[in-house]
């Protein structure tokens, strides 16, 4: 199978896993928003933020280092496996020992500390399966990875729904995380058994190069997590835990929902781009095309969600969550800008230049924290969210000048064109959607949402169909040929 065929197959499997995981996630989010109070949902959101942050330590960039390595010796894999497990134990101990202090950071009570303690056990369990997933990714065995993701997500979904329905308490989420982490580790280890040619031996000299590569990734990831999670932490201190709960729901049905497509691109692009990493000309061409293609998917979905947000929240959520409508809309705009980052990060990974993103991350923190604090004091929750939007605009502009141009020499006019083309093609959809929203207001929220969504989809399809741009014609032919191939196979 050629590299192109492997990449296309990988995208399909990742997309399937992402879609099903998103469906399970949305259903559980909807159920929990009805079953729990705003305060309880805030506790859950804070616990998940902490869990995500600590999980960054578990991998330490080792997985990406394994994926990009042309050859791997047995002692390398053995030593890296030992490091993963050691980091899992360290992360667990940190969470257990400092659970009370972490909870106080969010102005929370003992319930959050209990959540953290339960989740900490999952860090050790997860560490045993990290290398197995890295090896499967390196071999581009995305079919197995997708099946594992779907199975563990379904197990998490069933656990969350059943426990929350019975006990109506935040700790149910922590226990469900523990159950799904166990399932994911077991399934990953089993699927990767033919690739596991290592034991529990350790030699520091065998992992030096992986540390040099991984340290850039883990510091960058930690800075990124601090940057993202600064906003909910400030919400808890300036407003309340309920504000975090509302922000989490808004994020999940806007940026979070569509950001799940980013791993579909990054997890499949990285191994594929690694094969052409030595040819900057090919990398530039691939980056520009991928930027346009991903924007053609992300822009209409996020901006479409921004338009239907008032109806969506009114139809699916209780009155206690109506305050999240403007938050969803601002986050959708921020998400559209943020989606441009995925191809850039893939290129930096291939070129082993993640230190560039690290410096940019520090700059975003220096600007973002005081800006967000100021806007939060002035305008409350919506001010904090606007702070997030401003930082995303800054990141997109600086991303070209400090990341792309120095790493592979992309011309500014070419990169701007790759963004402007999808932006211009989505503009008629946005205009038509806003007009339809006000025109169909008398129909009621449910019919209004359906009518607006239909208008947006139809307008976008027509715009794409009649587009004179060559890259759009290529995009259209790619989508059409895949659909025809699927139909003729049936």
Write out the residue ranges for each language-model feature.
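Signature of the first transmembrane helix
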Residues: 3-60, 87-99, 118, 122, ...
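Interhelical loop/hinge segments that connect adjacent transmembrane helices in multipass membrane
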Residues: 1-3, 7, 143, 186-229, ...
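Transmembrane helical elements of multi-pass membrane transporters/channels
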Residues: 10-25, 176-180, 184, 188, ...
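Alpha-helical transmembrane segments of multi-pass membrane transport and lipid-handling proteins
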Residues: 19-23, 82-107, 114, 118, ...
